[in-house]
């Protein structure tokens, strides 16, 4: 269950303001979450795949930074 163009368009349509809204933080977080779930599932069966484990750490870090940005942005708007 990998991220192909149809699934990517569906995620963007569900979380974005329009179907072309790929830069929105919420859309980026949703796409990263989908990738993280797939990689986590892959690592359950391939425990010694250390390169994929490292890429998972990078994706989790990116998502964490985006979540922190959204939290900071929402607090300043209030």
From Swiss-Prot:
* Signal peptide positions (record): none
Keyword presence, Mitochondrion = no
A Gene Ontology MF term for this entry? rRNA binding
SUPFAM superfamilies from the UniProt entry: S15/NS1 RNA-binding domain
Q: List the disulfide bonds.
A: none
Q: Which domain of life is it from?
A: Bacteria
For this UniProt record, the keywords arranged alphabetically read as follows: Ribonucleoprotein, Ribosomal protein, RNA-binding, rRNA-binding
| Biological-process GO terms, alphabetical | translation
Q: Which family does it belong to?
A: Belongs to the universal ribosomal protein uS15 family.
Which purpose does this protein serve, as stated in its record? One of the primary rRNA binding proteins, it binds directly to 16S rRNA where it helps nucleate assembly of the platform of the 30S subunit by binding and bridging several RNA helices of the 16S rRNA. Forms an intersubunit bridge (bridge B4) with the 23S rRNA of the 50S subunit in the ribosome.
The record's annotation in HAMAP family points to: Ribosomal_uS15_B
How does this chain assemble? Part of the 30S ribosomal subunit. Forms a bridge to the 50S subunit in the 70S ribosome, contacting the 23S rRNA.
What name goes with this protein? Answer: Small ribosomal subunit protein uS15
Q: Which organism is it from?
A: Karelsulcia muelleri (strain GWSS) (Sulcia muelleri)
Tell me the name of the encoding gene. rpsO
């Amino acid at each position: 269950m990998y991220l192909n163009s149809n699934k990517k368009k569906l995620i963007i349509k569900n979380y974005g303001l329009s179907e072309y809204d790929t830069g929105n933080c919420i859309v980026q977080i949703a796409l990263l979450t989908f990738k993280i779930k797939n990689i986590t599932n892959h690592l359950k069966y391939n425990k010694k795949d250390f390169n994929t484990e490292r890429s998972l750490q990078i994706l989790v870090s990116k998502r964490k930074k985006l979540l922190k940005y959204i939290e900071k942005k929402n607090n300043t708007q209030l």
